[in-house]
Design a protein with these regions (language model features):
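Positively charged n-region of N-terminal signal peptides that target proteins for export
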Residues: 1-7
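Residues forming the ATP-binding cleft of Hanks-type serine/threonine protein kinase domains
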Residues: 478
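Formylglycine-dependent sulfatase
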Residues: 8, 12, 21-471, 481-502, ...
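Short hydrophobic beta-strand that contains or immediately precedes a catalytic carboxylate
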Residues: 474-475
Length: 530
């Protein structure tokens, strides 16, 4: 059980103000009585690329300027999860991990180009077998037709922000990003409309499991018309690392990672938002200094991003109101999360994929009035592969042994198992595709992070053939939570790095990701591991 916050100075004070005396730890046992508890309804709301820094309950630099009162409400009436992490920070693989409770190397979805095996015994099917009426609405992004759901109405591929197409059950399925019928309106509103419509028409004799998945705030950050003037007169606070990165890297100064500045000429925000055709309008940087250009590109990016978040928060409120109006709130688990995090200018980056904190961390708030006390804060290390086992345990059904995740139901009720994980394994496979981020894997503990950038495509679908120089990064998260100082070469930390390398190999073996199928990577490991 972890009893501190990573961003102690800001987050602890904010949580103390909001949650009172309950904000200093994983709060004690729930006083709710689960005896004779009927199966809970479950609403799993997931957005796309929603950074913790863009949810006000987390107390970031954006909290006051861009509040999210409805998402915050879930936390205030339930639990705020501080240490939830993705196992492969990219849309399709993360969604597959959530459904299967497995890492990419087991579920077979390594990259955006891989098809999800819809014959697998995933969360939707298991909830059906447990007696639930099941539905998924919104972003699916797994290529193959949804299975395990009594109803689906999903976006083709990434989908559109305005007047989106949706593919409804009962009509011939067309692969991935093909097919669908147009629904007039803004996508976040439409997805909520269709989610509520299903709730109204569901089988009332069964508990329900609804996955309501939003496209926003994924790029290209097209906001609703009603939000076009939101934040116009505001100055968005900038992370210090937007301009200065200390000893972060070493690739920060090179052509890697999509940048806010023009540092990476292959993909950067400054070029995107100054060229004709950008969907939310362009900015004029003529005559500006380099720093002014970066500032302007950052302001444009984050304002558009936060405008899409505003619509999400409004629609979360609509779901909560529906539950209240229909007297369903008490016995309904409501979860809000994202498929991964997002960099909002930190280290001069946008996008996800990296093992850095802003990409690795997933927001998560959970409310279940029947069993979870309000105003809780949980600091246990939870992974996206834990979501399915947790929901299955709440549903009162068996968790398949093939799932690599573990239920954190008892953690939510204030009783963290003594053998709960204190470290996690991460791997990004889609080498150099789209945002020019090398293939890498690593280990994160409560205090440290070790990353090996191996820089090889390994014949993965969609990975680029460009080979990058292998290198290591090591961060002391307790003393350097912003990851500004790569201490891999620091003599003081060599014993810790050595121990982490051993633990990393143990995790890879346990998780069936040994690299033995990739002789070129094994050769690289033999050369660069010590």
């Amino acid at each position: 059980m972890i009893r501190y916050f990573q961003e102690f100075s800001v987050l602890t004070l904010l949580s103390a103000f909001i949650f009172g005396c309950n904000s200093t730890a994983n709060i004690g046992h729930s006083d709710k009585k689960p005896s004779n508890q009927k199966q809970p309804n479950i609403i799993f709301i997931m957005s796309d690329d929603h950074a913790k820094n863009a949810i006000s309950i987390y107390g970031s630099r954006l909290a006051e300027i861009a509040p999210t009162p409805n998402i915050d409400r879930i936390a205030k009436e339930g639990v705020l999860m501080n240490n939830v992490f993705v196992t492969n920070s990219i849309c399709t693989p993360s969604r597959a991990a959530i459904l299967t409770g497995q890492y990419s190397q087991l579920n077979g979805v390594y990259t955006l180009k891989d098809d999800f095996d819809n014959s697998t015994n995933h969360l939707g099917k298991l909830m059906q077998k447990a007696g639930y009426s099941t539905a998924v609405v919104g972003k699916w992004h797994l290529h193959t037709e949804p299975t395990g759901f009594d109803y689906y109405n999903v976006l083709p591929g990434q989908g559109l922000y305005n007047n989106p197409k949706l593919k409804e059950i009962g009509k011939p399925w067309k692969y991935h990003n093909k097919g669908g019928e147009v629904y007039e309106g803004y996508v976040t509103d439409v997805i909520t409309d269709e989610s509520i419509k299903w709730l109204e028409n569901r089988d009332k004799n069964k508990p329900f499991f609804l996955m309501s998945h939003h496209k926003a705030p994924h790029g290209l950050w097209e906001f609703a018309k009603r939000h076009e003037n939101l934040l116009n007169d505001e100055e968005i606070p900038e992370p210090n690392s937007l301009y200065e990165n200390g000893n972060h890297g070493p690739l920060i100064g090179e052509r890697y990672g999509s940048s806010i500045s023009d540092r990476n000429p292959r993909r950067n925000m400054l070029h995107q938002v100054t060229r004709e055709g950008w969907p939310t309008g362009i900015i004029d940087t003529l005559g500006m200094t380099k720093r002014e250009k970066i500032h302007s590109a950052y302001q444009k990016y984050v304002k558009d991003y936060l405008r899409t978040v505003a619509a999400i928060d409004e629609n979360v409120g609509r779901i909560l109101d529906y539950l209240d109006d229909n007297e369903l709130a008490e016995n309904t688990i409501v979860i809000y999360t994202s498929d991964q995090g997002q960099l909002l200018g930190e280290h001069d980056y946008f996008d996800k994929r990296w093992m850095y904190e802003e990409s690795l961390s997933m927001p998560m708030v959970i409310r279940y009035p029947a069993m979870i006390n309000p105003k809780q804060v949980n600091n246990d290390m939870v992974l996206n592969i834990d979501f399915a086992p947790t929901l299955l345990e709440f549903a009162g059904t068996e968790v398949p042994s093939k799932m690599q995740g573990r239920s954190f139901k008892s953690n939510l009720l204030g009783s963290t198992p003594t053998d709960w994980r204190t470290s996690m394994y991460y791997r990004y496979w889609m080498h150099m595709a789209h945002h020019y981020i090398p293939g890498h894997y690593g280990i994160r503990t409560k205090e440290y992070k070790l990353i090996f950038f191996y820089g090889l495509p390994l014949n993965r679908n969609g990975a680029l053939s460009e080979i990058t120089e292998p290198y290591w990064e090591f961060y002391d998260l307790k003393n350097d939570p912003k990851e500004m100082n790569n201490l891999y070469a620091d003599e003081k930390y060599q014993h810790i790095i050595k121990e982490l390398k051993v633990e990393l190999l143990v995790k890879k073996q346990k998780l069936e990701d040994t690299d033995e199928s990739y002789p070129e990577l094994m050769e690289l490991r033999n050369k660069f591991w010590n």
